[in-house]
Amino acid sequence: MIRTTRTKGGLLILAIIIGLIIGILVPVQTSVNTRLRGIVGSPFLASLLSFSIGTVFLIVLTLFVERNFSLNPGVWSEPGWIWIGGVLGVIFLTGNILLFPRIGGVQTVIMPIFGQGLMGLLIDNF
């Protein structure tokens, strides 16, 4: 029992550290993508480039970790809303690129976090 508790505690600390690192990277990503917008002249082109590079990275990562691209055939019979995650990612990324120069870095990071907290409460309660 003690050994399991230590392992779970160690994993919890690791998860917290990873969460903090991800939190640190969100404003960095927004800042980098806003700079990219200035270079290419369009928030949508900046988002497209960012997602394209991310897609290439995910392909390499998937091949390295999973060793293949096979999907469970049952995935195609799932409801259509299951595929909306990518669209929501584009809205989030492009929205941040549009907001950053208008409201600044702090509010561009804080408002989505506040929204996530509100939505998390709704999801947990309904």
Regions found by a protein language model. Give the residues of each.
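Alpha-helical transmembrane segments of multipass membrane proteins
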Residues: 54-58, 92, 119-120
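Hydrophobic core positions of alpha-helical segments in small-molecule transporters
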Residues: 49, 111-112
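Structural motif at transmembrane-helix junctions in multi-pass transporters
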Residues: 39-42, 95-111
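Membrane topogenic helices and adjacent juxtamembrane segments
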Residues: 26, 42-47
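Membrane-interface interhelical linkers
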Residues: 2-21, 35-38, 44, 53-81, ...
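Hydrophobic alpha-helical transmembrane segments of multi-pass membrane transport proteins
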Residues: 24-32, 72, 76-103
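C-terminal transmembrane-helix exit sites in multi-pass transporters
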Residues: 116-126
